[in-house]
Amino acid sequence: MNSRLCIMALLLCFSQALLGHFTVIEEIEKLKKYFNSSSSDVGDQKDIVSDILRNWQNDRDVKVIESQIVSFYLKLFEALKEHKTIQESINTIRADLIVNFFNNSREKMDDFIKLTTIPVNDLQVQRKAVNELVGVMHRLSSNIRRKKKGSRCCFGGGDRLNQNYPARSI
């Protein structure tokens, strides 16, 4: 009986996840219809975001470009806030971004937006940013080194004595 409940709960979770995904897709379709994005003049041009994303293959690199893409869409949604007829769609998509990109943390999203709206032409901001730069660079470089160390696997080489026969040891 206990396993049946677990299976039912698992199915419920999957159905909720799929339902949420379809809801976002429906809202995106509403935006496409609102902007008439299937028009021939839209298809004649190169993609704005998809082509760029295809160029970034490395996992570490993908996170960098994904953050820029999310920033782009958040700015786009902010610019569209006056369009009342599509606000529900925008809010649904924004909520999905919070769940998927910001690990369901509104605070992380607020920090992200705060960082993207800092006025870089302000002299005081420039002075503070330059003052913090050494610490920021140190933290970023140590994060990259940590990721490189963590990405080593027992199947990918590393410090094993016998790399040709992973199951054997000398």
Swiss-Prot record:
GO terms for biological process: adaptive immune response; defense response to virus; humoral immune response. SUPFAM superfamilies: 4-helical cytokines (SSF47266). GO terms for cellular component: extracellular space. It is found in: Secreted. Residues 1-20 form the signal peptide. Released primarily from activated T lymphocytes. Glycans are attached at residues 36, 103. The keyword Secreted applies. GO terms for molecular function: cytokine activity; type II interferon receptor binding. Its main location: secreted. Keywords: Antiviral defense, Cytokine, Glycoprotein, Growth regulation, Secreted, Signal. Pfam families: IFN-gamma (PF00714). It comes from the Eukaryota. Type II interferon produced by immune cells such as T-cells and NK cells that plays crucial roles in antimicrobial, antiviral, and antitumor responses by activating effector immune cells and enhancing antigen presentation. Primarily signals through the JAK-STAT pathway after interaction with its receptor IFNGR1 to affect gene regulation. Upon IFNG binding, IFNGR1 intracellular domain opens out to allow association of downstream signaling components JAK2, JAK1 and STAT1, leading to STAT1 activation, nuclear translocation and transcription of IFNG-regulated genes. Homodimer. Interacts with IFNGR1 (via extracellular domain); this interaction promotes IFNGR1 dimerization. Belongs to the type II (or gamma) interferon family. This is Interferon gamma. It comes from Sigmodon hispidus. The lineage of its organism: Eukaryota, Metazoa, Chordata, Craniata, Vertebrata. The gene is IFNG.
